[in-house]
Amino acid sequence: MKRAFVILGIVLCSLSLAMLQGQEKHEFGSYKEMREYLGKLFSQKKYDEAASLLESVLDKFPDNVLANTYNLALARLFAGDSEKAIRALEEGHRRGVFYGLWDFAAKLWDPVKSSTRFEAFLKENQARVEEAQKRASMKIEVATPAEYDPAKKYPLFIALHGGGESVADFKPSWTSPRLRGEFITVYVQSSQVASMRGFHWQDVAVTRRDLEAAYKRILEQFPVDTGRAVIGGFSSGGFGSLVAAIKNFLPVRGFVVLCPEVPTTIGDEDILAAKARRLRGTLLTTEADNRVEQQRTLMGRMEKLGLPADFHLTPDIGHWYPKDFEALLDRALGFILEAGKSE
């Protein structure tokens, strides 16, 4: 009997060792490897295990504290522990980060929204956003066309990033053969803070100030054909592009926007004035974008009032770039610049 207990103890020790060894296999050589494994845990709804993993790597990946504490809070929330979810966000603050303006807008955060502790967290987070706003400024990056010759004049494309993005995030996606080959493209980064690494265009007065300053700087430094300027952008950048083009913040020939938030301040008189200036535009969107109906309504108003505008909807995709975006962008440039020559 004693021997049986000894054997059982050895077996249990062996099992425990095997379990520990199994856990030790999850040593990650990079943040990417960890995120891939974390994604599997979330997809399998192993939220407690995901939370334990995230807690264990907070010190290992100090450059990713923002994402890791946010995902830790999500894991705790999905596991049904609201207090630990808030504690994870407070840990992010303790480690020096703050969260984005829209990070807690989704309904999944409803379980914590009535908590006084969460309200205190949000107040502190807003204070950090406001402090970051004091240091923020508009920035630009310029891409000149292939075989650029400063003695020639080139069409200009003013490109505006999406909400919560930076130029670094946006620039690789917003490009096309015509932009690379023919245009001076200025990527403008808003001064309006959305998150630690991202910005937005929702304040119309600030958007106007930023864009007018960027446009002035470009004209001073580059040979722009001011009669062939186009503005465009994604999501919040689409919002900024629409108000800038239709309300005549900048003297552009047209706009190209992808999945934009639709400005509510654009009146029929603005559209008629834009028509008189011979403005043209293209609105690209996707079937699962949550603003499709507002986008359709705006385009319907433009059509009714006689402003030439093209509408294109890509099926089976959400709020993001369609696979043929570059071709769609070049087609839109043709619609604005070439078709407008005969008017």
Locations of regions flagged by a protein language model:
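Primarily recognizes the serine-hydrolase "nucleophile elbow" in alpha/beta-hydrolase
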Residues: 227-276
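Alpha/beta-hydrolase
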Residues: 154, 158-160, 258, 314
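The feature captures the conserved acid-bearing segment of alpha/beta-hydrolase catalytic domains
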Residues: 261-330
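Catalytic active-site module of serine/aspartate enzymes centered on a nucleophile-bearing elbow/loop
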Residues: 327-343
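Serine-hydrolase catalytic machinery in alpha/beta-hydrolase-like enzymes
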Residues: 156-224
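A domain-start/cap signature at the N-terminus of enzymes
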Residues: 23-26, 31-44, 87, 94-154, ...
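Alpha-helical adaptor scaffolds
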Residues: 26-77
